[in-house]
Amino acid sequence: MILSPRRTVALGVATVLAGVGIASAAGSPSLSAEALSGYLSSHAGSAKAATGTPKVPAATPKADCGPGSHPEGAVQGRVPLADYATGRAVKGYTCNSGAVGHIGSTGGFKTFRYTDRTGRVCAFYDGTLLFPTSLAHDNEAPGVHVLDMSDPARPVQTARLVTPAMDSPHESLALNPLRGLLAAGMGSPATAPGVVDIYDVSQDCRHPVLQSTTPLGILGHESGFSPDGRTLWISTTAGPGVTAIDVSNPVLPSIVWHSFNYTFHGMNLNADGTRLYGADLGSSPGLTILDVSQVQKRDANPVVTQISHLTWPEVSIPQNTIPVTIKGHKYLVEFDEYSKGTSTSPSSAVGAARMINIDNEKKPFVTGNMRLQVNQPAARATDESKDPGAAYPVQGYAAHYCGVPRTVDPTIVACSFIVSGLRVFNIADPYHPREVAYFNMPAPNTLPLKSGAYAMSAPSFDVKNHSVWYADGDSGFWNVRLMNGAWPKGL
């Protein structure tokens, strides 16, 4: 079923900005021309490699694969060209994991699990990697796919959302489970008018109900909900710009704050919505923590202030953050996308993922890392650039998104590592993460550009069934069960 035919939104950015106060609070420097060029060129495939050997952390210890596994070869995360020649790659690679359910042949950047007020369980995932260029790449229609997951082994598509933002949400698809709101801000190429669509999924998640379509995002790309579901934050990577939208009434949303002082990729908020953890793409890429309490309280003329900023030597393109608490201590799971330069050069550092302690929010620090052997300069100096998907500028051996089963003592984190598939790490000790499972189903080269795995989406979790849900841009939606002790006891 196709919901709400595609339509043109006539209101322009000037209309949105009319009467809206533009904040001028001090914050991270605006995105420099060099940084913007680097970011856009990395997506377009023309970034120049760095020189020298970058300083990177050690690879995370490999998973110990138990019975029923079909493990990789010697290099953690690699699917070599030879495996395609022998037919090994088409069988997939599993370690302490197995496929429970599968549907579709394409995927995007976000995957969500949701239980509505009647107890129905649904999945939502976007299927548009980059509109309109992905139309030639995919053999499925774009938009946000809605699945009935009553039987996790047999997903059933019940709707496809194709309103403007849902047709091309890029990385902005967001779900607030408390209120049952599904939203997106239209994004990319670089990065589209920020048309915002809001749906109510609380009554029957199989059939979302459109609440509004407005141009309030100004420019889109990424997003984040406050935990109470009253504020939708939209960010753009086409220069600085962050917008806070009041969605208390999703039929009549309104801008409550906007600033050109920050250039964020993704962002997340703490439990009370007063702290924003931004993946900063400014002149010093990394993490920026903002005090947004006045926005959350709906103060008149709210002021947002910067609390701290952190970067790390191997930073590439900071993607997003997840606030978690582990044994009473506060951390962020932070993940970078791609590499700092070209997809394959050993001189271009792969950002991968990390744990950041924020007990003292004024002095955050990195405690541990999640990265694979295939991400390391030594591996990139070999012939891995010949592996299918490795040299494609917006694919490659790198990280993209992560997800956790819960925010308090999550124990594990699942991350999409693009050509290396879905990787699962134990973070019970955030100073020493270790890999415990992986699942990688490379796609055969049957369509233009389709080659290798394209695991890009933020995963979600089916805790009851010890499963992880994610979408691969080349092979669709997957429901993967963890086995052999990879799923932690007590979770």
Regions found by a protein language model. Give the residues of each.
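Secretory targeting and sorting signals
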Residues: 2-28
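Feature marking well-ordered beta-strand scaffolds used for ligand recognition
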Residues: 29-491
